[in-house]
């Protein structure tokens, strides 16, 4: 436990008023350093094991990588970490649970630590997210552009949509696109998000994923 608690402090995660208990619950926004923290825990303490319901790491020569979790998995070893605990069914034996409630449906546990500062996207995106009700911050700057669909001559970066009408429009124009479920866990330099309804009417895990995949620029396109 001491290794994880030390790293949570080093990475700037905020302690909540929830009394410490087993398992430790950590909620973190995209780009907060969650995955890097878990990898550091594996390197620093060989008694720690980590598995995830998200995207697992590729095996390395040392064996210190985040492995894929199985449905119904039980924690093993002296200290077990489960990443993305909200994305699957798990059993007992885990000592530390990580996830992001904003990207998941359903109820979450009370957090002992939160990481709400993203180092991926910047303050322009954060302002949009905060206006939508998300408790999030950023350590950097980025660019957010808003365009009308008829101004969209050459879409930039990876195009994401979640509405059927937008999907049909993009198919009609033979434009390649992705759904939020296809890019969860991914990061791109530039993302173009195309939507019909106002963002306020789309609030939910899919929208949050779509608006948090970029590093430098987010283009919001509507009609």
UniProtKB/Swiss-Prot annotation:
A GO BP entry: transport of virus in host, cell to cell
Q: Under the GO molecular function aspect, what terms does this record hold?
A: ATP binding; RNA binding
Domain (+)RNA virus helicase C-terminal positions: 137-223
Q: Is the keyword Translocase in the record?
A: no
Q: Where in the cell is it found?
A: Host cytoplasm
Looking at the record's lineage, which domain of life comes first?
A: Viruses
The record's subunit annotation is: Homodimer and homooligomer. Interacts with capsid protein. Interacts with host AGO1; this interaction targets the host protein for degradation, thereby suppressing the antiviral RNA silencing.
Q: Which Pfam families match?
A: Viral_helicase1 (PF01443)
In its miscellaneous comment, the UniProt entry states: TGBp1, TGBp2 and TGBp3 seem to act together for cell-to-cell propagation. TGBp1 is the main movement protein that physically cross the plasmodesma with the viral genome. TGBp2 and TGBp3 would facilitate TGBp1 function.
Which protein family is named in the record? Belongs to the Tymovirales TGBp1 protein family.
Return the InterPro entries for the record. Answer: (+)RNA_virus_helicase_core_dom, P-loop_NTPase
Which GO cellular component terms are attached? host cell cytoplasm
Function, in words:
Transports viral genome to neighboring plant cells directly through plasmosdesmata, without any budding. The movement protein allows efficient cell to cell propagation, by bypassing the host cell wall barrier. Increases plasmodesma size exclusion limit. Acts as a suppressor of RNA-mediated gene silencing, also known as post-transcriptional gene silencing (PTGS), a mechanism of plant viral defense that limits the accumulation of viral RNAs.
Under what name is this protein listed? Movement and silencing protein TGBp1
Keywords, A to Z, come to: Host cytoplasm, Host-virus interaction, Inhibition of host innate immune response by virus, RNA-binding, Suppressor of RNA silencing, Transport, Viral immunoevasion, Viral movement protein
Matches recorded under PROSITE patterns: PSRV_HELICASE
Ranges for domain (+)RNA virus helicase ATP-binding:
1-136
């Amino acid at each position: 436990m001491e290794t994880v608690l030390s790293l949570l402090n080093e990475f700037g995660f905020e302690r909540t008023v929830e009394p410490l208990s087993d398992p430790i619950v950590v909620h973190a926004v995209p780009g907060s350093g969650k995955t890097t923290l878990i990898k550091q825990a594996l390197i620093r303490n060989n008694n720690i094991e980590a598995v995830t319901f998200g995207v697992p790491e590729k095996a390395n020569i040392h064996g210190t990588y985040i492995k894929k979790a199985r449905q119904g998995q039980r924690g093993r070893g002296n200290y077990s970490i489960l990443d993305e605990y909200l994305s699957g069914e798990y059993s007992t034996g885990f000592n530390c649970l990580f996830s992001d409630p904003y990207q998941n449906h359903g109820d979450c546990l009370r957090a002992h630590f939160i990481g709400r500062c993203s180092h991926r996207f910047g303050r322009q995106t954060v302002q949009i997210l905060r206006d939508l009700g998300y408790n999030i911050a950023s350590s950097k700057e980025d660019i957010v552009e808003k365009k009308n669909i008829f101004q969209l001559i050459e879409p930039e970066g990876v195009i994401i949509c979640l509405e059927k009408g937008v999907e049909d429009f993009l198919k009609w124009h033979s434009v390649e696109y992705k759904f939020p479920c296809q890019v969860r866990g991914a990061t791109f330099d530039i993302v173009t998000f195309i939507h019909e309804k106002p963002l306020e009417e789309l609030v939910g895990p899919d929208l949050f994923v779509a608006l948090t995949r970029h590093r430098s620029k987010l283009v919001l396109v509507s009609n």
